[in-house]
Every structure is written in structure tokens, then in C-alpha cells.
């Protein structure tokens, strides 16, 4: 029981989205990140799937609540409701499919319109292991990311390459924005919550200041 309690102790909770066309490997990326293995029997997501994981980002423990959204158009009205209050997102395309790359602008527009106004997005060119079938060059996607102020990585849900790094980079940037004051976890719709560990740190100075004030009055 003690180990379970310790494993659930975290400083911050971030709401994440995984968005992009159907067939880009979004569910496989989520499964690889959480389970550290490839999801062989992956079917198209119907509606929304959910996963969570606690990661260590520069000494802070961050719990990611990750919503994997369906990429098919018929589910868009359902999945859009989950965008609200997301702090971060993985915007995924398939490097072997020009069609999934061409759809990125629509997904990006939705994310920036419906999620937190300060949402941090990383572009992920998935299926890096299928380089021989590539239809989208690294340079082209890199330019798209730069033009739209996105971070960018190519990933492989099959081999695990850059999968954890994608989530880590996104979480690290959010954490940096909190520490610089650009993001306020207490603002409604930020997609960020303080965890128990952070709340204890926020309260502890008040407890230590009270006795010293009394001592001064004596």
C-alpha cells in the first residue's frame, strides 16, 4: 500500500491530447509510452481512449493524463469536447502517408481554438521505422513545425524510438512555462493541476512562519 501511495505522489498533473488522422499510430504511441511495448492488435480508436503515467521532469514528478482521440471524421464532434483545458498535445502524422500530413493544419486549428490558449504542441512524424516507404521528408515537416511554432520529432511506436522523448519534451516545455510565470496552474482551463507534493510545499512555508511571528511578539 505504501508503494502505491508513493507512486501516486506528484508535483503537477498535465492534461495531454494525442491527435491526428486515423491510422497514424496514435494508440500505438500511447501504448508504447505507458507499457514500453508495441500494441500488435491496434484497431482504430472509437471515440476516445485514456492512459496516464507519472514521469520525472528535471526533478519534478508530473502525472500525464493522456487522451487518445479518434482520427475519423465521424468522431470529430465527440473528440472535440475533450480538447477543452488540454495543456499539451502530440500532433501525429504518418511519414509514409502524404494524406495524414496534409491534414495537420486542420488538427492544429482545432487544438489551438478549442484547448488551452497556451497549449504546447509537439509534431510527431510516426512510423520512422518505415523509412523506405517515406512520403514526407524530415526537412518538409521540420519547416512546417517551425512555421507553426511547434516542437518536432520523428517517432516509431514499433521500436519505441523518440516516443518517451516526445512526451518528455512537451512536459518539459510546460514545466518551464510554469516556472517562468507564463503559465498559471490555478487559472481555469490551463490543463494543469497541482499534485499533493506541490501543495504540501506551497503550504509548508505558512506553517513554519506562524511560530516565528509569535516568538517575535514575546
UniProtKB/Swiss-Prot annotation:
Q: Where is this motif: Switch 1?
A: 44-49
**Subcellular localization(s) per the UniProt record:** Membrane; Cytoplasm; Early endosome membrane; Recycling endosome membrane
Q: Which residues form a coiled coil?
A: none
Q: Kindly list the GO CC terms recorded for this protein.
A: cytoplasm; early endosome membrane; endosome; extracellular exosome; glutamatergic synapse; insulin-responsive compartment; perinuclear region of cytoplasm; recycling endosome
Q: Where is the lipid attached (S-geranylgeranyl cysteine)?
A: 216, 218
Binding-site residues, Mg(2+): 27, 45, 68
InterPro entries this protein is in?
P-loop_NTPase, Rab4, Rab_GTPases_membrane_traffic, Small_GTP-bd, Small_GTPase
EC class of this enzyme?
hydrolase
Q: Which Pfam families match?
A: Ras
Known post-translational modifications? Serotonylation of Gln-72 by TGM2 during activation and aggregation of platelets leads to constitutive activation of GTPase activity.
Q: Where is this motif: Switch 2?
A: 70-79
Q: What is known of its domains?
A: Switch 1, switch 2 and the interswitch regions are characteristic of Rab GTPases and mediate the interactions with Rab downstream effectors. The switch regions undergo conformational changes upon nucleotide binding which drives interaction with specific sets of effector proteins, with most effectors only binding to GTP-bound Rab.
Q: Which purpose does this protein serve, as stated in its record?
A: The small GTPases Rab are key regulators of intracellular membrane trafficking, from the formation of transport vesicles to their fusion with membranes. Rabs cycle between an inactive GDP-bound form and an active GTP-bound form that is able to recruit to membranes different sets of downstream effectors directly responsible for vesicle formation, movement, tethering and fusion. RAB4A is involved in protein transport. Also plays a role in vesicular traffic. Mediates VEGFR2 endosomal trafficking to enhance VEGFR2 signaling.
Q: What is this protein called?
A: Ras-related protein Rab-4A
Lineage here is: Eukaryota, Metazoa, Chordata, Craniata, Vertebrata
Amino acid at each position: 500500500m505504501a508503494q502505491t501511495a508513493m507512486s501516486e505522489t506528484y508535483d503537477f498533473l498535465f492534461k495531454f491530447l494525442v491527435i491526428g488522422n486515423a491510422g497514424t499510430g496514435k494508440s500505438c504511441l500511447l501504448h508504447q509510452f505507458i507499457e514500453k511495448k508495441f500494441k500488435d492488435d491496434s484497431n482504430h480508436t472509437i471515440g476516445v481512449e485514456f492512459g496516464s503515467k507519472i514521469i520525472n521532469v528535471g526533478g519534478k514528478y508530473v502525472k500525464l493524463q493522456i487522451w487518445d482521440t479518434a482520427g475519423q471524421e465521424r468522431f470529430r464532434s465527440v473528440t472535440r469536447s475533450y480538447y477543452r483545458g488540454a495543456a499539451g498535445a502530440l500532433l501525429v502524422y504518418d511519414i509514409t502517408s502524404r494524406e495524414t500530413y496534409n491534414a495537420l493544419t486542420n488538427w492544429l486549428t482545432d487544438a489551438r481554438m478549442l484547448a488551452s490558449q497556451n497549449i504546447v504542441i509537439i509534431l510527431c512524424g510516426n512510423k520512422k521505422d518505415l523509412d523506405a516507404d517515406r512520403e514526407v521528408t524530415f526537412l518538409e515537416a521540420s519547416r512546417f513545425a517551425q512555421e507553426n511554432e511547434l516542437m518536432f520529432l520523428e517517432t516509431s511506436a514499433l521500436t519505441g524510438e523518440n516516443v518517451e522523448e516526445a512526451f518528455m519534451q512537451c512536459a518539459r516545455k510546460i514545466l518551464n512555462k510554469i516556472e517562468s510565470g507564463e503559465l498559471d496552474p490555478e487559472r481555469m482551463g490551463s490543463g494543469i493541476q497541482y499534485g499533493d507534493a506541490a501543495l504540501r510545499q506551497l503550504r509548508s512555508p505558512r506553517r513554519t512562519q506562524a511560530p516565528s511571528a509569535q516568538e517575535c511578539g514575546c
